[in-house]
Amino acid sequence: MPALLVSKSPLLSGEVTIHGAKNSVLPILAATLLCRTPCVLHNCPDILDVTHTRAILHSLGCASERRGASVYIDPRSCAGHSIPPELAASMRASSLFLGALLARQGEASLSLPGGCPIGARPVDYHLLAFRALGAEVTEMDDTIHCRARRLTGAKITLPGPSVGATENAMLAAVGAEGVTVIENAACEPEIVDLAGFLTACGAKIAGAGTGRVTVKGGQPLTGATYTILPDRIETATFLCACAACGGTLTLRRTAPRLAEPILNSLTESGCRFSCTHDTIQISRDGPLIACRPVISKPYPGFPTDAMPVLLASQLRAEGQTDFTETIFENRFGYARELKKLGAQLRQDENTVHLRGAPQLYAAQLFAEDLRGGAALVLAAMQAEGESTIFGVKHIERGYDTLEAALQSVGARLKTVEIPKKM
């Protein structure tokens, strides 16, 4: 089985180019089903979740091709409405095909989706939106089936600002006759990016990025060429790597305005920054000071997906701080792995209390989810000796060439094949 061997890193130095946002490209790939002509997506990360999403498109009769950092999708031959269970189980974002298929085919069927084991993440809010638009929704065992002869615009009030439910409501609303208003919508930049793509294809959407999104549906969409937003979580990962190990890194083709929460926390820790409209330079040459307590919140608050890497960056910081998770109840599964390295932390329900340790030591670690896996890599880069990290597939779900990028700036890590024990 593949594993990462990670040794203590020297000071990091160099440049890293940030890829397109995982959390943008997945709903946008699903949205291509709404188009009647081909689409081209630039800055498309080459990650496992994109591979799985393209496989779903292929299973529905669509064609796609990758050329470098661009993906070409031809949805004209879309014929199916059911997503194969093995593909649905591969990632959470498979649920986004419900809204797109309902709008295009009038019918959608999906086994309950998979993804990272960081919490329940029910699709109840998604189904509420479909029902409001006039769809008949049935749930049997582990399968969801949606059907609508005609979708009609409506007011949808989400119980909470769910990113996935907002995206699914937008996708379905594009195919609904009339005006749909989504109240209590999520405000994340990836919502704005999805709206940008749909607008480029001819959709009429207002308010994306606010708590009230309006969609005037029923118009046919044509394919467009679109560039995916930079990944703010990948940005956070490299910023935290430099904070943890010290040195100077320049991140290119990123979006500093979307990284403000992580920049603020790392500034508190003693890091220095210089930013342009699409670059961030981070330097850390003095002691790392524990940042103020962090609480994950919906945008524009601190992103839950960036909390694991920030926590990992603080393992040897001077002082103590707290990390409170309010989005996913099982987010801190990686904390017990960090303890193997000698991290001085204690979990109290949804809060981790952390005191900086004078030294960390190599251990055998197991990644169980995407962001927790990235945290283990950053932690192992600070530990004396050579750590072994299993569960590499989780990291590959959301990072494009993470290993090579870290190697290029001085980190000592490599993927090896370790035989399974009989």
Which residues does each PLM region occupy?
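Short, structured segments at the rim of ligand-binding sites
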Residues: 1-422
